[in-house]
Amino acid sequence: MRARLALRLAKIEVQIQEIDLRNRPPELYAASSKGTVPVLVLNDGTVIEESIEIVRWALGGSEKDYALIKRCDGEFKQHLDRYKYSTRYENVDPQFHRQQGSLFIEHLNDELGKADYLAGNEFGIPDLCIAPFIRQFRAADVKWLDEQPWPALHNWLQRYLESNDFKAIMVKAIP
């Protein structure tokens, strides 16, 4: 999601190919031996295999932009996975991971209380990289998250979900 949004914001036209992860086509493995998505194959044959690297390639950014993203991709993502997908792990307490993930969300709410976006006054790289994961965290229990006392985060996430750019990247490509 964040790779698609970065490419859209950078106005880079790409051909999107939807992949059924239960039935990965040989072309995916030909482009990337890892067989994971996203994969961006440039005209010169260069392959970029990670969403964060696609964001860097498309939009650049500073180390400051990526500091909060690194925290999200590390500790928060670990808690998100064990909260939302607890059945994939042994001996996992999803409520513990929800509580631990909430600490990061509380930090985001505090930051968003100072400015409209994580990047400051405008939607930027930290916003486009972190919002998809907050959306996933919310999807695990919408009612619970919506009841939390995080007004700045709720407003930020709602603006993201209602944005034309988000709606555009959520349209499924025709196979």
Placement of each model-derived feature along the sequence:
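GST-like domain detector, emphasizing the conserved glutathione-binding G-site
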Residues: 1-102, 109
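A generic structural-conservation signal
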Residues: 16, 121, 146, 169-170
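Secondary-structure boundary/capping residues
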Residues: 37, 63, 117-118, 169
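A late-sequence structural motif
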Residues: 163-167
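Long, charge-rich low-complexity segments
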Residues: 172-175
